[in-house]
């Protein structure tokens, strides 16, 4: 039999400041880059309390599964000059921990959001001589690794979804709990906004987005309501959309399954930012960028993301021997081994301390050595 590879055993073992805005993609070196805390989350819109952007900058965000991420990636980072890619930098909470724990580590931090790069740059200023920050979507990882590390690295971390920093900034329009412009762009310089999707997509396209990206069973009904409403007045704010969703979704369904806007907001955000398209390209590129014994860890927060990661990891850990042969051919074994048994979740203690960790699903693999 040719098994997929799983192993729990392997789990042990000239300075210049960038001028904003950057063009995308752009590779920029930040010589002096500090802030405070961070985290990334995909609770699709429920912001705890309204607050200004300034308040958000001062409010701590707790990195999800921080200790476990360090535990999983540490064996790949022990050599002097090892390189880690934080493919979803956010405010830099995970990166700060790795840079602190591994004094010889070099970091490449990726984010499409210029605000995130600014905040992370300030936070990581004490490590300025060891970091490279790159403004790009995470599917730009291959170019970033080629330009900053010669094409291969020792470990990569993805923390998918919208970041807490983005979610808590009311003016970004990610939250359905407060009225704000219908924006939802992770990169404020991008062209497409949620308002444009709502006001320009035809009814069939809207239903597809809601069904595929929000798994919304009332997708067709909601799309019809949107088209009728925008014929009178175009959508401009999140509050207008939430009000429509209360009208479009039948009352019995509104009483179960969470906030009635949750799935629609998730779907619009994914469409605006091409999140799943980017992820489908990013995971194979990340696997390809690892050196032998390099490790990749991915945190997903909803089933659509996790399904993509699970499928890619299953293929990577499968035998390369042609089907039908009774034994594995030499040199045709799996290219990667799994470091987690399925998807790991946050424990009750972490969820109590950081409720936004509740939906996380963590998967990790290691590249087999000797190639």
From Swiss-Prot:
Which terms does the UniProt entry file under GO BP? rRNA base methylation
The catalytic activity, as recorded, is: cytidine(1402) in 16S rRNA + S-adenosyl-L-methionine = N(4)-methylcytidine(1402) in 16S rRNA + S-adenosyl-L-homocysteine + H(+)
Broad class of the protein's primary localization: cytoplasm
Keywords, ordered alphabetically: Cytoplasm, Methyltransferase, rRNA processing, S-adenosyl-L-methionine, Transferase
Keyword set includes Cytoplasm: yes
Gene3D superfamilies assigned to the protein according to its UniProt record, in alphabetical order = Putative methyltransferase TM0872, insert domain (1.10.150.170), Vaccinia Virus protein VP39 (3.40.50.150)
InterPro entries for the chain: RsmH, SAM-dep_MeTrfase_MraW_recog, SAM-dependent_MTases_sf
Cell location: Cytoplasm
How is this protein annotated for GO cellular component? cytoplasm
- The record lists S-adenosyl-L-methionine as bound by 92-94, 111, 138, 159, 166
Molecular function as annotated in GO: rRNA (cytosine-N4-)-methyltransferase activity
* EC number in record: 2.1.1.199
Q: What does this protein do?
A: Specifically methylates the N4 position of cytidine in position 1402 (C1402) of 16S rRNA.
Q: Which family does it belong to?
A: Belongs to the methyltransferase superfamily. RsmH family.
- Stored HAMAP family: 16SrRNA_methyltr_H
Q: What is this protein called?
A: Ribosomal RNA small subunit methyltransferase H
**What is the species of this protein?**
Mycolicibacterium gilvum (strain PYR-GCK)
Instruction: Write the gene name.
Output: rsmH
